[in-house]
A protein has these predicted regions:
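ATP/NTP phosphate-donor binding region
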Residues: 1-85
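Active-site nucleophile and cofactor-binding loops and adjacent substrate-binding regions
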Residues: 63, 89-91, 247-251
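Carboxylate- and glycine-rich phosphate/diphosphate-binding segment that chelates Mg2+/Mn2+
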Residues: 141-246
């Protein structure tokens, strides 16, 4: 599945144009509980939605590390209102939740089984990251917790249709979160580059990510400028593109034990 991506400070201008490509009367918005407003997304998204003749149902009542119960609750809401397009605005967990909702709305199967059956067409999914780190906007994986154990759900249909990487959403990110998210992106780029399944294309994406992240990440943590934020956002996207091809290796395998609770 091919994904469309818009990068940079003018990328947000494409959101309304993309939404107008689809025929729908009810939009499902998956968003962060607090970040949606603090990053400046709320005013922008409200203005865009006002240009559309549609209702909007919001879903934000879920854990930072989404649980299977959060997924089930979101699916009930999505089905109740018969929404026909999904937009996600938030960090990695928000984007993962939207990806899982879109996937399991159309596919049956126990989320941690790895065995899924398509039952109906996928809903369009547009994602807008508000952090520069996970690369979730560019991958066909999503993380889910079941009984306090971390699982990765993988399927080509999990990849969002459209990613809009609008760096200004990251301009107010706190220092600690900037560092954690940025190091996540750098680690994924390196992990993809040394991967046994690396390809010419994944190497190109990984190198592009490293070239953007390596010099700018320390600066964006200690004395950020908008230009640096732009480069780190772009680097995180390319890191996601790289690891989407190679998949993960030992660092991610170790992380599952560290992040299970």
């Amino acid at each position: 599945m091919e994904q469309r991506c818009f990068l940079g400070e003018s990328s947000i201008e494409n959101l309304l144009l993309v939404l107008k490509e689809f025929s729908f009367s009810h939009l499902f918005l998956v968003r962060g509980r607090n970040s949606y407003e603090t990053c400046g997304a709320k005013s922008i998204m409200t203005a865009v939605f006002s240009e559309l003749d549609c209702e909007v149902t919001e879903y934000f009542d879920f854990e930072e590390n989404p649980k299977i119960e959060d997924l089930e609750r979101g699916l009930l809401l999505l089905r109740k209102y018969s929404c026909s397009v999904i937009v996600a605005v938030g960090g990695g967990s928000v984007l993962d939740m939207a990806k899982l909702l879109r996937f399991f709305y159309s596919y049956s199967g126990e989320p941690t089984s790895g065995k899924f059956e398509k039952e109906k067409d996928l809903l369009p999914l547009i994602v807008l990251p508000t952090t520069a780190g996970t690369g979730s906007e560019a991958t066909h994986f999503a993380v889910l917790y079941k009984n306090k154990v971390k699982y990765s759900v993988e399927h080509n249909a999990i990849l969002p249709d459209v990613a809009i990487v609008y760096p200004p959403f990251t301009y107010n990110t706190p220092r600690y979160l900037t560092a954690c998210a940025g190091f996540d992106a750098l680690a994924q780029a390196i992990e993809a580059y040394w991967n046994a399944y690396a390809t010419k294309e994944s190497d190109e994406f990984a190198k592009r990510a490293i070239e953007l992240l390596w010099p700018n990440l320390p600066l964006v943590v200690n004395s950020p400028t908008n230009s640096m934020r732009n480069k780190v956002s772009e680097g995180a996207y390319w890191a996601g593109r790289a690891i989407n091809i190679t998949k993960t290796t030992a660092p991610h395998a170790f992380s599952y034990s560290f992040t299970t609770y």
